[in-house]
Amino acid sequence: MKIQKVWLIAVALGILVGSGGCQRKPEKTRIAMVVKNLGNGFFNAAHIGADEAAKQLGNVEVIYTGPTTPSAEGQIEIINSLISQKVDAIVISANDPNALVPIAKKAMLRGIKVVSFDSGIAPEGRQMQLNPSNAELIGEKQIQMAADAIGGAGEIAILSASAQATNQNIWIGVMKTLLEKPEYAKIKLVATVYGDDQSDKSYREAIGLLRSHPELKAIIAPTTVGIVAASKAVADEHLVGKVYVTGLGLPSEMAGHVKSGAVKEFAIWNPIDLGYAATYAAGQFITGRAEAKPGATVSLGRLGTVTLDANREAALGAPYTYNANNVDKFAKLF
């Protein structure tokens, strides 16, 4: 009799526990987006795309974070915290491709998927790298815009982000190679400086270029922070119409500079799409629908699919050109 009572109590408890479990909502999948630095308009737009992907994936929470100033040390500290929080994936634009490898490996060993986008982590530190575009196309576009602005002849300079930024260094390498071609023989690259993607430092570096090179005709800034700073510097030095700025910028931040004449045209991919695609890809790795191996196909939701190359990298597409004819339209979007 005693045994029967114990058995009945156990069954009753099992029913209660079971019914409680049925009512419990499944835990949300957490994808952390770690950007180069907070307060950067490009990454704010990428965050919008990440949230869109989260809604489509379903039951996904996006944790948007990054250091206040762009540094590998700041990102390492953040990733350590995310590992402790046991997030499901980290989507990151890296401030240094190699310095982040050990902490990224630690995350992957804990079962966290790592997808780098925009500026990549070295292959051993992530499942996938999503490039916004093809490096050759990006470099070529910026040289072409600068050449058109100055009539194919004159001195130009480059204002980049940090000296360790993977993407900018690759693009600059492409630009330097292109400048060796006969069609650009009359264009001379006189300096490459770094503003570390900080507005004040980028502005100071741009002022330095303008004052050190009185014959300068154009500044190429392959960074959304740098192009704004350089445009302001040209205006403040009363050089609009004498020195032109081009590079990669956000329409919402560049519309005024296009209207002022400091910028004839600039280019950028859609950061909303980039953030969306990177987050959607992370979701595929979390659920096992994508494999981190060369030749694997990864779904990017509304943007279709991409195939990973030998380094497990893929690209979205060519950058788009913005000028006085279309900048206002796109400024309303990002």
Predicted feature residues:
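Short, low-complexity disordered leader/linker segments with a strong preference
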Residues: 1-30, 56, 83, 105-112, ...
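Extracytoplasmic "Venus flytrap"
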Residues: 30-53, 57, 62-79, 85-87, ...
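Short, solvent-exposed amphipathic alpha-helices that sit
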Residues: 42-56, 138-142, 166-186, 201, ...
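Short beta-strand elements in bilobed, periplasmic/extracellular small-molecule ligand-binding domains
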Residues: 56-68, 155-158, 180-197
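Hydrophobic alpha-helical segments within soluble ligand-binding/sensing domains
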Residues: 75, 130-156, 201-203, 250-254, ...
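Hydrophobic alpha-helical
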Residues: 92-108, 175, 191, 195-257
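Flexible loop/hinge segments that line or gate small-molecule binding clefts
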Residues: 98-137, 145-148, 155, 161, ...
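Hinge/cleft segment of the Venus flytrap/periplasmic-binding protein
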Residues: 163-167, 178-180, 281-334
